[in-house]
A protein has these predicted regions:
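Polar/charged low-complexity regulatory segments
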Residues: 2-188, 193-210
Length: 210
């Protein structure tokens, strides 16, 4: 099913759910554009925004809280700085260390590898974040494998967490545009960058969503 027909069906289904999916029946974005904006739609959905339009539909008050309190974005300069940071896929960097530790065998052996890593010794906050990610990885990997998302630890390493970084970059750049911190061209650069992050890694929406 192509994306255009998918959103059409979602619009019809919406009427059956009081708090269902929020789609605009009058929106007719090309499928290529829908693919790109959909990368940020988990976050749009969480804020009860519109899923099939370029505009997120997030209310101004909520938008201000997300940008200001969660991401420290209060003006153009902070918006550019944060979007540049998000475009570097920071979660993927953390995943690299946590995943490498995970491959050491798990448990205390993996934690020892992170704690003794020379590259992390002067970055204790980042190292602690990596330790948390390692714990989550050890807890969730059996479920990921059982669900058929990956068939091995090596395949999980290839998938990484680029979906998380790409989704945030997509969503936050659109909020910044709506808050008038950036212009449309800059927003599109972020959206395209997010799409490029994922298209070579995820071959289907199931892999991306997980």
């Amino acid at each position: 099913m192509d994306m255009t027909s998918l959103w059409g069906r979602l619009a019809k289904l919406q009427s059956f759910f009081q708090d269902g999916l929020n789609v605009d029946e009058n929106s007719h974005l090309p499928e290529a554009d829908l693919r790109k904006i959909s990368l940020g739609n988990l976050y749009v959905y969480q804020q009860q925004g519109v899923l099939n339009t370029f505009e997120t539909g997030v209310t101004p008050s909520v938008r201000k809280v997300i940008l200001g309190e969660y991401f420290g974005i209060t003006d153009r300069d902070s918006a550019i700085e944060t979007l540049n940071w998000l475009s570097q896929a920071p979660s993927q960097t953390m995943f690299h260390y946590a995943y490498t530790a995970f491959l050491q065998g798990g448990g205390n052996i993996s934690r020892k590898w992170l704690n003794e890593n020379e590259e992390l010794k002067e970055h204790t906050d980042f190292r602690n974040d990596c330790l948390e990610k390692l714990e989550t990885m050890e807890e969730k990997y059996p479920d990921i494998e059982q669900a058929g998302i990956v068939v091995s630890k090596e395949e999980m390493g290839k998938l990484g967490v680029l979906a998380w970084d790409a989704g945030r970059l997509n969503f936050i750049s659109r909020l910044c545009l709506e808050q008038e911190y950036i212009v449309k061209e800059e927003c599109m650069q972020c959206i395209n960058a997010a799409y490029e992050m994922t298209k070579e890694v995820y071959t289907n929406w199931k892999d991306y969503a997980y």
